[in-house]
Amino acid sequence: MSGSPVKRQRMESALDQLKQFTTVVADTGDFNAIDEYKPQDATTNPSLILAAAQMPAYQELVEEAIAYGKKLGGPQEEQIKNAIDKLFVLFGAEILKKIPGRVSTEVDARLSFDKDAMVARARRLIELYKEAGVGKDRILIKLSSTWEGIQAGKELEEQHGIHCNMTLLFSFAQAVACAEAGVTLISPFVGRILDWHVANTDKKSYEPQEDPGVKSVTKIYNYYKKFGYKTIVMGASFRNTGEIKALAGCDFLTISPKLLGELLKDNSKLAPALSVKAAQTSDSEKIHLDEKAFRWLHNEDQMAVEKLSDGIRKFAADAIKLERMLTERMFSAENGK
């Protein structure tokens, strides 16, 4: 005989409870780590792909990407760029075999201040997915939430029907501009905001509800829901499960396999912390941002300015490491090294 409903409910993992009111997304390039947690979607970034590309399990994908880059030919730089785009798409396509929803694939962070280059690179990634038999409805293109990135997202959505995930989002200004651009989804960061406050203020620990990253996402969620924006809010970059639980009820949350594992083992009761109903009574006031107002408001937030800049540099550095790794694999033999 099965246990009583009350007992069964008590034994339900925090992860299963979370899935009842939030879409759970796996934040990893290691697609073999996804199965156990049964997420709806998955997100990748240059750092995660770099880590996965160094694992023995994924060397076939790396070899396939290298072969593709060589086959297209052209200058060495062009071959490497094509190999990297292909590698991102190969990982994305494999991840899609394991999830019912969408995968996020990131445009090179070094293009973060070049709208046209971001649009072109995004369209190229979608074309590569198409060649792999994957339709654009299953892809989210990740772009840095600079002014240029947000405008690239607007153009991709409106003119090309390409869905965008705006990443490296730390300020309320970035969130408002993304909502006004009508992008599909935003990824406001939580843990990196906490990191900044721990490093730059006297306060070194926070209860989850007081966590500055949690408060930032809560404010954005309430603003979006109060004013009827359709853009999905997906909290990202978590340092602990307390932050995740404090954002239960958010549209989506993207979570690393390590923290998904902790939530799976956790049987404590979980209730939604965010809701559309509560958002209606929040004290948000609607604002409109043109480029000048956006730049001013974003610049007023020291944490956001530093973390956006830092995030772009980190993703760019990992893109360069990936390039070096592929360059070595592609050209070292023929250079007689």
UniProtKB/Swiss-Prot annotation:
The modification N6-acetyllysine is found at K115, K219, K269, K286, K321. It catalyses: D-sedoheptulose 7-phosphate + D-glyceraldehyde 3-phosphate = D-erythrose 4-phosphate + beta-D-fructose 6-phosphate. The gene is Taldo1. It comes from the Eukaryota. Catalyzes the rate-limiting step of the non-oxidative phase in the pentose phosphate pathway. Catalyzes the reversible conversion of sedheptulose-7-phosphate and D-glyceraldehyde 3-phosphate into erythrose-4-phosphate and beta-D-fructose 6-phosphate. Not only acts as a pentose phosphate pathway enzyme, but also affects other metabolite pathways by altering its subcellular localization between the nucleus and the cytoplasm. GO terms for biological process: carbohydrate metabolic process; fructose 6-phosphate metabolic process; pentose-phosphate shunt; pentose-phosphate shunt, non-oxidative branch. This is Transaldolase. A motif (Nuclear localization signal) lies at residues 1-10. PROSITE patterns: TRANSALDOLASE_1 (PS01054), TRANSALDOLASE_2 (PS00958). Its EC number is 2.2.1.2. The first 10 amino acids are essential for nuclear localization.
